[in-house]
Design a protein with these regions (language model features):
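Alpha-helical transmembrane segments of multi-pass integral membrane proteins
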Residues: 380-488, 754-759
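Non-globular, low-confidence helical/coil segments that flank catalytic cores
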Residues: 78, 138, 149-150, 154-163, ...
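Aromatic-rich juxtamembrane segments at the membrane interface
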Residues: 184-329, 338, 604-607, 700-705, ...
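N-terminal leader/targeting segments
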Residues: 1-77, 190, 194, 201-202, ...
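Alpha-helical transmembrane segments of polytopic membrane proteins
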Residues: 22-32, 374-375, 431-437, 493-497
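Hydrophobic alpha-helical segments
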Residues: 1-17, 301, 339-340, 453, ...
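Hydrophobic alpha-helical transmembrane segments in multi-pass membrane proteins
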Residues: 46-48, 191, 253-428, 490-540, ...
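Membrane-interface helix/helix-cap signal primarily in integral membrane proteins
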Residues: 56-267, 584-585, 589-596, 602, ...
């Protein structure tokens, strides 16, 4: 194996992620020619050829797009159920071998959807959700074993009427790359079930053993939940148990994921290299003990133990759901144990390179995944400490454990910081304690209890003990997250400190000269991450005027609304986007990453226009993570939503019509605003949205919330009553996402906006913005932008009265 091939693989993979398949292929051809001219290393070229062939084989599957004309259409799908999860939002099915019946085009919208003889196979998998309120979509077990319950559906064919859409990212400079994740997972589309037509026979194929293991996994999870309910275990303890043993991460709440991220312990509850390697090690140790009395030679015993360890680790990974981290762990374990399995004498770097190469061959696009780099950096750190270390006394081995944890923390810190933008400052200390506890005590104990539970019922004391231990651990983690310094945004860390960590990491690698090529594993990641972070909106020029510029950002939160107003160190948010029953919310996914990227950790003002979930869904989530000085709630009272806001009573007020006043409490920066509470005039629902007018250096912005025609008419009628207020605005945040029941001609004639900014989800089921509205905007001389098409929209106002509109996408 030659390092040239390694470099080419890294740069091609990362280039694929950044520049597209074709451009990266041209790059690799140029590099290949350079190797042919400079060297004649056949094995490097052979390895590169294998990699390219594997990549080409995956290209169609990875980059297959769900046909846009099928979005939001009723489709009939024939598929095999390969995975099933019961979540807070409903029942989630993962379908494989999907065949779509193409609907016949309807000339009458009222006509029933008909399907012709044409069908198309979908590459990859399809994820659909069955919502409890859709009666026609509920699963039909068709006489299956009632003891199996829903788990009996796994491995069976189903015919469903579904609505699907392809994967799409929220188009903001800072966002979770859901599209890349779905490509890595091989997931082509997602949606929901409208009608369950039939349940067929069992699926037959090469993945039959995996389907049977998945069915067993689901049955074990149902049994574990049943025992836990009988013993009254705390929900967090049950979720942790399921995640550690069966990979049931869906049982963890959004709040639990935030705690894990803040304490740097996410890797402990996601089945990955730590868990798979531990299971393999325990199996190998048990096998060595079993064959010890048989007098088998040492070399044969090592080989036999390695094969058994790998087989047990593979079964455990399959039982855990065989997610991407588990897949990488099995591949890496195979590479690292390759020499032991075949009796070969391979060095650490050779084994690591084999694992690295095989991972890229099987999952080429994983090189742009943060988990890929974390996994190999962690193994590298452990190898630096343990490789070729002679046996020493127990205290020396203990020091090696501490050194290994220190190396992990040091080397993973820059990778995590560059990949996520955050670092956990308490993570190194927490992991110093919890990694040995989980590895040596907790995971083996939970595995033993779980296996025993399958064979015979256990006494209540075991469940109580597990509950006490897991609850205690969780309480400790939650306590650490309350520390103000527990987590930091990379942008807050001085460049010298961050650079020093990178330099020290490099020195640690260079201490052993034969490790220097592996240092290059980090360099492309750093280079491409920094290159990607230089988005056009991130480079906002400094303004020479005394008053700082005002930035108004309409965030892309899908079908919802969130507007961020920023001037100097002052910040206001208007609405917070949606929160779904699964726990996913736009505050965690979009709003907080955007704010933290600018170093913002507190809000001067938070305005909730009205109580619809697509505007207020993330309220509690944001209040748990950000300091809010003033909280302005809707005029209408909603007790069910306000019951958890008692702690903020001294900061709360309600939307009320006001005269012009300074938005900020100090006089250093001036930004005039006024509220118009339409609920005071007898309106309710959407029409009672809190309307905001901003006067920014002589320019006016109208934030209309979800008002519709009736409220618009009320606003027009009130023009003469509200201190001679004028509705004429340079920028209008479109009422009600541009629905056909809003943006009336009279309203637009009074506002006369130069720009209309629409917040709507792509291919949303409501048809927002309506075509008649966009035509009306043009007719009134307004330019309009839609977050569904243009992504995040930034408007910059400078003190000389000039302003510019900058969409994230052209």
């Amino acid at each position: 194996m030659y390092i040239n091939g390694l470099f080419l693989l890294i740069f091609w993979c990362l280039g694929w992620g950044q520049f597209g398949f074709s451009n990266s292929l041209y790059l690799i051809i140029v590099l290949l020619i350079a190797i042919l001219v400079a060297y004649t290393r056949r094995r490097a070229i052979l390895g590169l050829t294998v990699f390219l062939l594997a990549s080409a084989g995956q290209y169609d599957r990875v980059y297959s797009q769900f046909p846009y004309p099928w979005v939001s259409k009723d489709l009939r799908i024939h598929a095999c159920v390969s995975k099933l999860d019961v979540t807070r939002s409903g029942i989630s099915l993962l379908l494989s071998n999907a065949q779509i019946d193409i609907p016949i085009v309807k000339h009458d919208k009222r006509a029933k959807t008909m399907y012709g003889g044409l069908s198309k196979a979908l590459a990859g998998q399809v994820k659909v959700t069955i919502y409890p309120y859709t009666k026609a979509a509920q699963p039909q077990l068709n006489g299956m074993n009632e003891n199996l319950g829903l788990a009996g559906l796994i491995g069976h064919k189903v015919v469903l009427i579904v609505r699907l859409k392809g994967a799409r990212n929220y188009q903001n400079p800072q966002h979770y790359d859901y599209l890349r994740w779905s490509q890595l997972a091989g997931q082509t589309a997602s949606g929901y079930v409208r009608q369950w037509l039939s349940t067929g026979q069992a699926c037959h194929g090469l993945n039959w053993p995996q389907l049977q293991l998945e069915q067993l996994r689901q049955r074990l999870w149902q049994a574990l939940q049943g025992y836990a309910e009988i013993q009254s275990m705390a929900p967090p303890s049950v979720g942790i148990w399921g995640a550690l043993v069966l990979g049931q991460t869906a049982a963890l709440t959004a709040q639990q994921w935030r705690v894990l991220a803040a304490t740097g312990t996410t890797h402990l509850l996601v089945i990955s290299g730590l868990h798979v390697g531990l299971v393999a090690g325990l199996a190998m140790l048990l096998m060595r003990l079993l064959i010890l009395p048989l007098g088998i030679s040492s070399s044969l015993g090592i080989r036999l133990s390695a094969w058994v360890g790998l087989a047990v680790a593979l079964v455990f990974a399959l039982l855990s759901g065989f997610g991407l981290p588990a897949q990488r762990a099995v591949i890496m374990l195979t590479g690292l144990m390759w020499g032991a399995m075949w009796g070969l004498q391979l060095g650490f770097t050779q084994r690591l390179f084999i694992a690295f190469f095989v991972t890229l061959v099987l999952q080429p696009i994983s090189a742009s995944s943060l988990g890929f780099w974390l996994s190999y950096t962690a193994v590298l750190a452990l190898g630096l400490v343990w490789y070729r270390c002679p046996s020493q006394q127990w205290w020396y081995r203990g020091m090696q454990l501490l050194a290994a944890q220190g190396a992990l923390s040091l080397l993973l810190l820059p990778v995590i910081g560059l990949g996520t933008g955050y670092v956990s400052l308490v993570g190194p200390l927490v992991n110093m304690v919890l990694v040995p506890v989980f590895s040596l005590l907790l995971i083996p104990a939970l595995l033993l209890i779980s296996v025993t539970l399958m064979l015979t019922p256990l006494a209540q004391v075991f469940f109580r003990l597990v509950d006490v231990v897991l609850s205690g651990l969780w309480h400790g983690l939650e306590t650490l997250t309350r520390l103000t310094w527990s987590q930091a945004f990379v942008g807050w860390i001085p460049l010298g400190v961050f650079g020093s960590v990178l330099i020290v990491s490099c020195i640690c690698l260079l201490i052993r000269r034969w490790h220097w090529p592996l240092l290059m594993l980090l360099m492309p990641l750093i280079f491409f991450t920094l290159l990607k972070s230089q988005s056009p909106q991130a480079r906002v020029p400094e303004h020479p005027h005394t008053q700082p510029p005002v930035f108004i950002t309409l965030l892309d939160v899908g079908q919802g609304l969130s507007l961020w107003v920023r001037q100097g160190e002052h910040n206001m948010l208007y609405d917070l986007g949606n929160r779904y029953a699964s726990g996913f919310n736009l505050v965690d996914a979009v709003i907080l990453p955007e704010m933290l990227s600018q170093g913002v950790d507190q809000l001067d003002v938070l305005v909730i226009s009205h109580w619809d979930m697509d505007h207020s869904g993330g309220l509690n989530t944001l209040l748990q993570q950000q300091t809010v000085k003033r909280l302005i709630l809707p005029t209408e009272v909603k007790a069910t939503r306000e019951s958890g806001l008692v702690d903020y009573a001294d900061k709360m007020s309600r939307c009320a019509s006001t005269a012009w006043q300074n938005l900020w409490l100090d006089n250093a920066n001036i930004l005039m605003w006024r509220q118009i509470a339409l609920a005071e005039y007898g309106l309710s629902g959407n029409d009672a949205s809190c309307v905001i007018l901003l006067n920014i250096y002589g320019r006016q912005v109208l934030i209309a919330g979800d008002i519709e025609a009736k409220a618009e008419a009320m606003l027009v009628a009130l023009v003469g009553e509200l201190d001679s207020v004028s509705l004429v605005s340079d920028v209008l945040i479109a009422p009600h996402h541009g629905s056909k029941t809003s943006s009336t001609a009279d309203f637009l004639a009074k506002v006369r906006p130069s720009y209309v900014l629409i917040s709507a989800g792509k291919a949303n089921p409501y048809g927002h913005p309506h075509k008649k509205n966009t035509q009306a905007y043009w007719w009134h001389g307004s330019h309009w932008y839609n977050t569904a098409r243009h992504g995040q929209i930034l408007v910059v106002f400078t003190a000389n009265g000039e302003y510019k509109v900058r969409p994230y996408l052209p």
